[in-house]
């Protein structure tokens, strides 16, 4: 063993050993408990960032830990390789998206290996490969034949910047989730997957997911948006037409003063035939320049026009005017609402603007009048005829029963969740395996012609889809008839919705999944990724799992037992204002010299060119703020183990982590100390076997502290996921070992036991260093196959107490006494201690303060 820690040499050698020996390659072993650990599929953007490193380090720590428990551990990796960024990069660099993507994969694969992650590389998946998406196309056809896929012309979210459709889940505050551009609605033909058919299952099965964060489950519950209400039929006067309205609050029916319908409601279209003003309003208000989120905003200017039609109130038989408005969505409920301006802000705003009547009908429980900002959940009805004095819930039930009995009401369950728009007007994606015949008939591609292979090396010359210009690819044959291929491609969330299952059998060519392998490994035991995926990926992959189950391929209901959402990685950020453009120029923290005050706060910052900088605080690492730290630069400087240790130590894994190179240096110093401690221990020569019966009191104390550490670290990793406190405990016991006695063979034997345990417990965090230390300590076999240390319960039993001795409240000495020692014996023993006895000479003890088992304080006169 060399004297000084040299991570560069150590890490590359051990990584090569793992590669040559296929150390982390696994197969199904039904004699072992399995453990499937998975980090979310990365997009091959070109280089790893610290967010990647944090995510994958967490997964690797858990994988290595469970492998040491004797489990059959699978930790695979792959690439979410389709997507718009590749098209943008290809357009910018005048290359094919495939060229850019495959080059990035090779770069990132090399970087992952440099960090020492224990992946089973034999299971690597690349989603843009035909051998992967072939089965996605096949499954799509199965779903189409089951009626779970359909195509329709619909208003959909359209990103004008990326020239493609977005699912509702991909629109955030009216903007594209990827590029941030404002979203508009566009009426175009799209392919949909019937996720609404599984809405109840997706909702109810959340209650089974005890290992999921409550925040994610609540986000999904809210997105699914199940509501129980009633469809009420309003008769339109002088027409055979009726208007059906869905409401969850039938108790407010007596407060309705007008009805609102969406501009694309069939009744609006019908009324517009003989009403030029209405026709012009509908044409002007079509939601082509607004997203759905913008349409329903409470503070948006509300406009409308009277249709000239009236409906009859189902209980009072009053005439209710029907208005076409710009804030009612056709795709939610029935596209019509009953307006209760006395108890709804939006309805009140509209009523005030158009001088429509307002009727208050519900008071607070205490009798006070509520605000108009929203309907109160429970109140008392008044101004409501026969329902006066009833509470809201009771009134809702009675009114519902009356309407149902009269045949003008039907109880109904509605969902906020919409069917998933899975088609995209992009090139770099999985081709949708459908074709259109000359007579307009749309048919699936015959299964024996799958996969429909995407021509990989088309150049992108504009924002348009080059598939539409590739006539050789577009034209095909179907049963000797000319057919045209679908040029839309799948939403890339399709690929990432089932990759986890394909990892169980990546090379299986007889079907989508090998059911034996898939049902051995699934569900995932631990899934790791960001909470930003809560209502996109995490919803879709739950849905896909149920589809695979219902297709007979899986037996479990949910894809993963546990989810861990890691926090963001933050870093200092600095900028100056350009003298020429007035823009903010962001400067990398590694090129900044800072001055701090006595509390460590930054009070001045200058870059290498002499610009005086504005400190913008610690914010999420990003390219736009130029505050990303290259992981591989840090690995080159400190070694992978140091970076891994810092990442896991600097913060609880679910909290934000502030990048501090001073903290990295601290982690590196600790590893150097442990290396030197082990080196010095080995240099002292051969170690005898520890004789438990011959241990000194100091030996017993050190061994007890060791096994307390084993118990704590085990609990911190396995149950609490408190990796930072586990590392802190390992640092503490290491510090005690550095000050341990080496006077006897027994002393050295206890240090040997402790070092072997510490190295094994640190191994999941710093596997390269621990691999070498284990060898140097003559550990049995490779540490990759070593068992996790077991707590010796007898070592935890305390047969002695350490008593602190104080004189007049100041520390003077400490003594070790049997647990059974009483106060008198402790006073006697303390009085004989040299450091205590000299203070007692010629004085009298006025008072004795004794804390049993801990402290003796002698107060002198």
UniProtKB/Swiss-Prot annotation:
ATP binds at residue 623. It is found in: Cytoplasm. Keywords: Aminoacyl-tRNA synthetase, ATP-binding, Cytoplasm, Ligase, Nucleotide-binding, Protein biosynthesis. GO terms for molecular function: aminoacyl-tRNA deacylase activity; ATP binding; leucine-tRNA ligase activity. GO terms for cellular component: cytosol. Signal peptide: none annotated. Its main location: cytoplasm. Its EC number is 6.1.1.4. It is an enzyme of class 6 (ligase). This is Leucine--tRNA ligase. It comes from Baumannia cicadellinicola subsp. Homalodisca coagulata.
């Amino acid at each position: 063993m060399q004297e000084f820690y040299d991570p560069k040499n150590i890490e590359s050698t051990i990584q090569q050993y793992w590669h040559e020996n296929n150390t982390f390659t696994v197969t199904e072993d039904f004699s072992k408990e399995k453990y499937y650990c998975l980090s979310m599929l990365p997009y091959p953007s070109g280089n790893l960032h610290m967010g990647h490193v944090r995510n994958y380090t967490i997964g690797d720590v858990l994988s290595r830990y469970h492998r040491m428990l004797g489990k059959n551990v699978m930790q695979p990796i792959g690439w979410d390789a389709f997507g718009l960024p590749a098209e943008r990069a290809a357009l910018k660099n005048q290359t094919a998206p495939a060229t850019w993507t495959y080059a990035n994969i090779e770069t990132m694969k090399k970087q992952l290996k440099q960090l020492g992650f224990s992946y089973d590389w034999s299971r690597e998946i690349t989603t843009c490969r035909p051998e992967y998406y072939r089965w996605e196309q096949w499954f799509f056809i199965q779903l189409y034949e089951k009626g779970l896929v359909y195509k329709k012309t619909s208003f959909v979210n359209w990103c004008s910047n990326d020239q493609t459709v977005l699912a509702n889940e991909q629109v955030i505050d009216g903007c594209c989730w990827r590029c941030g551009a404002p979203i508009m609605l566009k009426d175009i033909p799209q392919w949909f997957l019937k996720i609404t058919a599984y809405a109840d299952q997706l909702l109810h099965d959340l209650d089974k997911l005890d290992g999921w964060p409550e925040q994610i489950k609540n986000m999904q519950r809210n997105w699914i948006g199940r509501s129980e209400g009633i469809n009420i039929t309003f008769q339109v006067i002088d027409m055979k037409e009726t208007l059906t309205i869905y409401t969850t609050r039938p108790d407010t029916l007596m407060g309705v003063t007008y009805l609102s319908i969406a501009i694309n409601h069939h009744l609006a279209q019908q009324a517009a035939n003989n009403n030029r003003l209405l026709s012009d309003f509908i044409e002007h208000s079509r939601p082509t320049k607004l997203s759905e989120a913008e349409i329903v905003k409470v503070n948006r200017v509300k406009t409308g026009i009277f249709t000239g039609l009236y409906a009859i109130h189902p209980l009072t038989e009053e005439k209710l005017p029907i208005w076409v408005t710009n804030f009612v969505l056709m795709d939610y409920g029935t596209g019509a609402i009953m307006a209760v301006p006395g108890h709804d802000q939006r309805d009140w705003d509209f009523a005030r603007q158009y001088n429509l009547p307002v009727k208050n009908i519900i008071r607070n429980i205490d009798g006070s009048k509520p605000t108009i900002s929203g309907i109160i959940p429970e109140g008392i009805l008044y101004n409501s005829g026969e329902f006066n004095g009833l509470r809201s819930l009771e009134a809702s039930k009675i009114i519902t029963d009356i309407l149902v009995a009269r045949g003008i009401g039907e109880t109904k369950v509605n969902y906020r969740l919409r069917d998933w728009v899975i088609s995209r007007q992009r090139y770099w994606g999985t081709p949708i395996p459908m074709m259109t015949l000359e007579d307009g008939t749309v048919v699936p591609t015959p299964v024996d012609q799958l996969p429909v292979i995407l021509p990989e090396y088309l150049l992108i010359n504009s924002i348009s889809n080059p598939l539409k210009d590739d006539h050789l690819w577009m034209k095909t044959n179907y049963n000797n008839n000319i057919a045209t291929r679908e040029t839309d491609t799948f939403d890339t969330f399709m690929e990432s919705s089932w990759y986890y299952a394909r990892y169980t059998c990546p090379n299986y060519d007889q079907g989508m999944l090998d059911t034996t392998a898939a049902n051995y490994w699934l569900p995932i035991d631990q899934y790791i990724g960001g909470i930003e995926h809560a209502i996109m990926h995490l919803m879709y992959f739950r849905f896909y799992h149920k589809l695979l189950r219902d297709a007979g391929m899986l037996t479990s209901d949910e894809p993963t037992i546990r989810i861990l959402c890691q926090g963001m990685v933050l870093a200092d950020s600095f900028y100056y204002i350009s003298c020429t453009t007035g823009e903010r120029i962001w400067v990398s923290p590694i090129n900044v010299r800072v001055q701090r005050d006595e509390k460590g706060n930054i009070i001045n910052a200058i870059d290498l060119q002499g610009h005086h900088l504005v400190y913008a605080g610690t914010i999420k690492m990003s390219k736009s703020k130029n505050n990303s730290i290259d992981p591989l630069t840090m690995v080159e400087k400190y070694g992978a183990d140091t970076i891994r240790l810092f990442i896991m130590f600097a913060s609880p894994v679910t909290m934000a982590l502030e990048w501090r190179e001073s903290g990295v240096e601290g982690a590196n110093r600790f590893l150097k100390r442990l290396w030197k401690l082990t080196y010095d221990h080995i240099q002292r020569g051969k170690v005898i076997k520890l004789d438990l019966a011959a241990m000194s009191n100091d030996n017993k104390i050190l061994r007890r502290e060791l096994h307390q550490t084993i118990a704590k670290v085990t609990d911190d990793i396995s149950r609490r996921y408190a990796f930072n406190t586990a590392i802190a405990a390992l640092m503490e016991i290491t510090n005690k070992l550095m000050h341990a006695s080496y006077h006897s063979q027994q002393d050295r034997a206890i240090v040997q036991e402790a070092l072997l345990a510490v190295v094994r417990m640190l191994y999941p965090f710093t596997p390269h260093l621990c691999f070498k230390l284990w060898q140097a300590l003559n550990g049995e076999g490779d540490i990759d196959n070593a068992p996790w240390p077991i707590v010796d319960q007898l070592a935890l039993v305390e047969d002695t107490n350490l008593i602190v001795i104080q004189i007049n409240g100041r520390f003077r000495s400490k003594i070790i006494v049997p647990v059974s020692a009483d106060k008198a014996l402790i006073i006697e023993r303390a009085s004989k201690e040299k450091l205590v006895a000299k203070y007692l000479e010629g004085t009298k003890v006025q008072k004795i303060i004794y804390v049993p088992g801990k402290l003796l304080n002698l107060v002198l006169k």
